[in-house]
Amino acid sequence: MLNKILLGLNKNLTKIIKTFIFFWLLLCVYRLIFIWGMSEYLSADSGHNLILTAIYSGAKLSLQTAGGLTLCMLIGFIAETIWHRLKYFRYICSFVILFITTLLFVARFPFYQQFHSGFNQMLFTAMHEDLYALFISLVEEFQLPLKLLLVIVLVAILNYAFNKFLAYSFKVKRWQILPEKIKTVSLLMCVYVLGTLSLYGGGWSWKSGVNWENAGITNDTFLNESILDDYQAIYRAYANQMRMEACNGLSFSAQNVRDLAKSLTNKDGGNDLSVYLAKEATGAKIEKPKHIFVIVSESYANWPLLDKYSNLHIADNMKKIIAEDDTIYTSHMLPSGSSTVGALMTMVTGMANSNLYLTTMPEALANPYITATAPQMKNLGYETSFWYAGPATWENIQEFTLAQGFDNFYSRGNIDPNATGSVWGADDEYLYDAIFKQIDDNKMTFSVILNTSNHSPFNIDLEKEGFDASKVIEGLPDKEKNNQELIKELGHFWYADKMASDFINKVKAKYPDSLFIFVGDHADRYNIDKVPTMYERYSVPLIITGKGIQKDLLPEDMAGSQIDIMPTVIDLIAPEGFTYYSVGKSLSENKLGQSYAFWITADAIGNTDDLVEKPQYFNREVLPDRTVLENYINGVRAISWWLGKYGTIIDEALLQ
């Protein structure tokens, strides 16, 4: 009896494994055909190695898809086990799955030709179109009936081959003589391995696997799109759409926005935000630099720079730069959001966090906002570039930055292919090396740099990089001296600190007429204290260094957030009368900063919900005026929300 049960189980386990292999191979073959059939979209410098990289990464990612399709087939297998005649239901299941898979594959060709992308959010846009007109267009322009017929014929052949493959018994003598128990254990182990690889996209954990967000590892847009099979592309479209729909922003009336804009800017711009946000430079404070680098550093919190933690020695290198005469540093700075994407959106658009997912919003992908960074730096004569250590597909970063006016975008695919790194991107040293090699002294250049090394999975070979763990251990509290995970995290902060300072010093030596702005993208990841103060937990440093910078160029009581960084840069370098647009203000006059949940001054920090009711002091016990603080917080949020969703004209009708 047991042997009979095991025999039946083994037959089903074998079918599951065969199904997985068949679907995975089919997805891989479809990918190869797509790359071959659309090879004209390959960039000129995409060689065989890059194509093989895309094929390999796509094969890993399709393990996940194959697992999902195999789970769908379980319905048919279970039905057939209950009653043998229900095998015809299994045939129907396989036909439906193969039909959808093949139909998507065929549809991908015209979709890419039209949109230069795999399936994306245009699928959801199409739902709001005239469906009848869309259907007629598909029939007339894309020969829908003929292509459907071809798909049905191809699927019939594939379905026949699939079911023959399931029924075929491989005659392996050594396998046949094994006891059924051994076969069961072996097959279960095989299913476990395939299931794990499927779950993590070709890896043993999320750290080594591939998913749709980190798949864009080449510098070829077409190859990055080919890595995603059609199901993964549709999931990407769905995920981005859900993010966008979940982030409808705040809620202000048109009159609220007008009143808050007046309060924030002391102007009466009527219904035109461009009037409220326009600013005029008073004249350059320093000689216009040839090259400007804005380094947005992953998880670079301010607390390691405090004297309180100097015995850890994890921020010594940036401290040396801070100590130099040509450097300004403030700790009275807040990030826009709690994650990297918040900093990305603010540094690119100049707008505060208003619960809008700008990287995927159609409005943000159509034209640059008037407050966008890149167009305003281009007006000052700079060629603008955005550098990201990770894949071009993360958070739609390539499309977003280019749509917001950057001349160039560089990502993992533009960095040494042999560079070490993690699933998030190349290690910082390779990122900075690629940027250094790209500097063209015949041009005025402006570069925003977003690194990734100070981020889990924390897999850098710190010993090889020269990290002395004993120094950190010596400075840790006794209860943390054996906390290897914390030591590794602090080691990665040390690495990010060292690589940034090395880059700054190297560029200064060769290109002395350069300006550097260094800021953490966010804090709040790890602290020594289990219950850190708000100031230690949430503040990030702002460091401005380079030719012409003097420590008294900005006031000591300045305070702000990431919306104030670019106005500060423009205020330092722009000629008198230069007009620019910003939600934030230059730190030469700004004394307040706000983020997604907090406010800060040169003396105190608090929660935006509580305003001045529950402050924490880190300097003098001085608080901002409650009404001024409330209007400031609401003002930058309301303006950013309206500008992000509706543009510059304040009109109640747009809310309908």
Protein language model regions, located:
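Transmembrane and membrane-interface helices of multi-pass
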Residues: 2-247
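Alpha-helix initiation and N-capping motif
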Residues: 26, 128-132, 228-231, 254-258, ...
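Short alpha-helical "patches" and their helix-cap loops
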Residues: 89, 246-256, 360-365, 583-585
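Short coil/turn linker and secondary-structure boundary residues
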Residues: 126-129, 229, 244, 252, ...
